[in-house]
Amino acid sequence: MKQYLRSSVLVIGGAEDKVHGKEILQRFWHCAGGTDAIIAIIPSASREPTIIGDRYVSIFSEMGAKDLKVLDVRDRIQGEDKDYQEYVEKCTAIFMTGGDQLRLCGLLADTPLMERIRQRVKLGEVTLGGTSAGAAVMGHHMIAGGSSGESPNRALVDMAMGLGIIPEVIVDQHFHNRNRMARLLSALSNHPERLGIGIDEDTCAVFQKDEYIEVIGKGTVTIVDGQAMSYTNHGKVAAEDPLALHNLRLHILGHGDRYNRKTHQPMAGIVE
């Protein structure tokens, strides 16, 4: 069986397969340690945390995980819970569910629980997965909401502070499924130094310790690199006026493709 890095961060575009092959969740489970996995599930983004937490417990239990715990954080004081912190200290993986990314950040940001999660991820001690809202929070800057399907403009996107787990990225999810290219470009117009990552449903960008992003799943991962952006009218036009952005680099990556975050170069996957 292929060995996967425990230090991986799996950023999922939402609506991942939970019934049939469950390819993305299987990858998370393997990275977590398979039958030896110790998995913390954080459903705090959801309006129904008990239901969604139990659903993922059932999925990972069916795969063979024996040690799972739902960290049901519903107010900020629970971010100081010693039992939760002790479980995060010993677990091999943490999974953040979908829901509302503002709610998730409001509950977890700057808590002792989140600080320890961030430290363990940075040290490569634990696998982290996040889907939908759990993916949106990964960067320092976060897309908190907005609209779809228009020309890029500043009014199209609402920004907030994320959890800073992968600080250099801005993530959008349900990407092509909800026509969100324009709002990702709108976000990047004010933060061209960040790497824009748009992830389709049932698709995952696997951030690996070796600086590579690997794509798995049924859709694509869109990468917008604004590092060489030569011009934007972001500060010169009204909020609802169209934005101009010059000299962006665009990559559309499919299953098996990779992207090097250091060299900013894509690599084609091996066709089997």
UniProtKB/Swiss-Prot annotation:
The active site is at S132 (charge relay system), E150 (charge relay system), H174 (charge relay system). It comes from the Bacteria. The keyword Hydrolase applies. InterPro entries: Class_I_gatase-like, Peptidase_S51, Peptidase_S51_cyanophycinase. CDD domains: GAT1_cyanophycinase. Pfam families: Peptidase_S51. Its EC number is 3.4.15.6. Keywords: Hydrolase, Protease, Serine protease. GO terms for molecular function: peptidyl-dipeptidase activity; serine-type peptidase activity. It catalyses: [L-4-(L-arginin-2-N-yl)aspartate](n) + H2O = [L-4-(L-arginin-2-N-yl)aspartate](n-1) + L-4-(L-arginin-2-N-yl)aspartate. One of its GO terms (biological process) is proteolysis. Belongs to the peptidase S51 family. Exopeptidase that catalyzes the hydrolytic cleavage of multi-L-arginyl-poly-L-aspartic acid (cyanophycin; a water-insoluble reserve polymer) into aspartate-arginine dipeptides. This is Cyanophycinase. It comes from Geminocystis herdmanii (strain PCC 6308) (Synechocystis sp. (strain PCC 6308)). The gene is cphB.
